[in-house]
Regions:
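Membrane-embedded alpha-helical bundles that constitute the cytochrome b-like, heme-associated redox core
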Residues: 2-200
Length: 200
């Protein structure tokens, strides 16, 4: 008798654990910088910008479909989480910019970087929902290719977020926080661009 083997995937909710651990590491580096600069520990307003960036990084990397991930996890479930986190992240980033509206206006890089990041990620999220979600894709006029290119504005959002934090004097001088932030951001963006050309 032939038996059909069903592949058992690991829990997709591991993603939330990875995001939590990554966020705690980055928050730790940030607070280290604040304490070294003589500032009190803990600032939830900054976290409303940093944690969404951590989410962007993790989900953008997983969207490249690394082999270690695809061999253990269900991609369909991953994209469901991807969409939900995309919506939540846009909302939190909008709240972050609202909290810092007056202060960010004093910095050209901080102001424009923040709003370019929000706009780019917002468009990337909407395009992903409209053109790349299986159920919605059937009723949209534009094709999958258009959706993919618009969704790549996510990379623009990551670069804009990096420019955003360089606009604030205190954070821009933090070591090792800022170098780590820069390396992760541009490392991932370059890797994604490399994969884009590799597939051609």
């Amino acid at each position: 008798m032939n038996q059909v083997e069903t592949k058992q995937h690991k829990s997709i909710y591991h993603i939330f654990i990875w995001i939590a651990v990554f966020s705690l590491i980055m928050i730790g580096l940030l607070e280290w910088g604040y304490i070294a600069g003589g500032r009190a520990f803990g600032n939830y307003k900054v976290y409303t910008g940093l944690v969404p960036w951590c989410v962007w990084i993790v989900m953008t990397y997983l969207a490249t479909r690394p082999k270690w991930f695809t061999s253990r996890y269900n991609l369909v479930d991953m994209y469901k989480v991807h969409r939900a986190l995309g919506i939540a992240t846009v909302a939190v980033i909008a709240f972050h910019l609202y909290l810092y509206f007056g202060k960010a206006a004093k910095s050209i890089l901080g102001w424009w970087g923040g709003y370019v990041a929000l706009t780019s990620f917002g468009i990337a999220t909407i395009s992903g929902l409209a053109f790349l979600t299986p159920k919605l894709r059937k009723v949209t006029a534009s094709g999958r290719t258009t959706g993919i290119w618009l969704h790549r504005l996510n990379l623009v959002a990551l670069v804009a977020a990096d420019i955003h934090i360089h606009g604030f004097t205190r954070i821009s001088k933090m070591v090792p926080f800022l170098p780590v932030f820069d390396i992760i951001t541009y490392g991932l963006v370059i890797y994604c661009i490399y994969l884009m050309f590799k597939k051609k």
